[in-house]
């Protein structure tokens, strides 16, 4: 595939940008806190320069559509929509929780991922993700906003071994169990958006337009 993809994530406290070009991914990630608006555009410019391309070379834009922090999500959506309109190219919105699951696969090659992302007081965004034999993730239908005191009951019902990722696990008390293994993956990375745009035959696959 010769198409060029720009991926953006500003859904939580970290900002990240990635460009896919000729089977190479150029990426940049920074801690943004409340500075998403200030940092994300210079980051995009820097990654484009590293890839030796301009905005006009892009064929697709993908972004993290949440769940996450409202302001950060709106920034990603706004940038993606602006580029789509000005360049007349399609955009793809990918779940933040599925991006975290993909990051766990990239780093640890694990297929059963429990994602918990910090939400409102006493709540987390929850998702149960499974990577199937076609190398695609299932689990977006399990995503929900859940009270922390309800999570232990959900975990007791799960079978097999699960990997825990996301910053929401800092808040969750749980029993020690061989079924669960926590990994130090707190934030999504835009480079993990790229695989969602490919199907088995390596053609771009529209998951959702915003």
UniProtKB/Swiss-Prot annotation:
It is found in: Cytoplasm. One of its GO terms (biological process) is tRNA threonylcarbamoyladenosine modification. This is tRNA threonylcarbamoyladenosine biosynthesis protein TsaB. Required for the formation of a threonylcarbamoyl group on adenosine at position 37 (t(6)A37) in tRNAs that read codons beginning with adenine. Is involved in the transfer of the threonylcarbamoyl moiety of threonylcarbamoyl-AMP (TC-AMP) to the N6 group of A37, together with TsaD and TsaE; this reaction does not require ATP in vitro. TsaB seems to play an indirect role in the t(6)A biosynthesis pathway, possibly in regulating the core enzymatic function of TsaD. Belongs to the KAE1 / TsaD family. TsaB subfamily. GO terms for cellular component: cytosol. Disulfide bonds: none annotated. The lineage of its organism: Bacteria, Pseudomonadati, Pseudomonadota, Gammaproteobacteria, Enterobacterales. It comes from Buchnera aphidicola subsp. Schizaphis graminum (strain Sg). It comes from the Bacteria. SUPFAM superfamilies: Actin-like ATPase domain.
């Amino acid at each position: 595939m010769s198409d060029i993809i720009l991926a953006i994530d500003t859904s939580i406290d970290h900002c990240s940008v990635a460009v896919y070009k000729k089977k190479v991914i150029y990426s940049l990630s920074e801690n943004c806190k409340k500075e998403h608006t200030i940092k994300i555009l210079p980051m995009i410019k820097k990654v484009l320069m590293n890839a030796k391309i301009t905005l006009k070379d892009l064929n697709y834009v993908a972004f993290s559509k949440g769940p996450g922090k409202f302001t950060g999500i709106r920034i990603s959506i706004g940038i993606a929509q602006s580029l789509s309109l000005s360049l007349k190219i399609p955009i793809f919105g990918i779940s933040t929780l599925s991006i975290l699951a993909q990051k766990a696969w990239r780093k640890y090659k694990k297929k059963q991922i429990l994602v918990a992302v910090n939400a409102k007081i006493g709540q987390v965004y929850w998702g149960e993700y499974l990577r199937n034999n076609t190398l695609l993730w299932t689990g977006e239908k399990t995503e929900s906003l859940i009270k922390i005191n309800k999570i232990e009951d959900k975990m007791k019902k799960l079978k097999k071994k699960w990997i825990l990722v996301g910053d929401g696990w800092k808040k969750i008390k749980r029993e020690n169990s061989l079924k669960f293994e926590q990994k130090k993956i707190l934030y999504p990375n835009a480079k993990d958006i790229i695989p969602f745009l490919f199907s088995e035959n390596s053609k771009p696959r529209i998951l959702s337009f915003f």
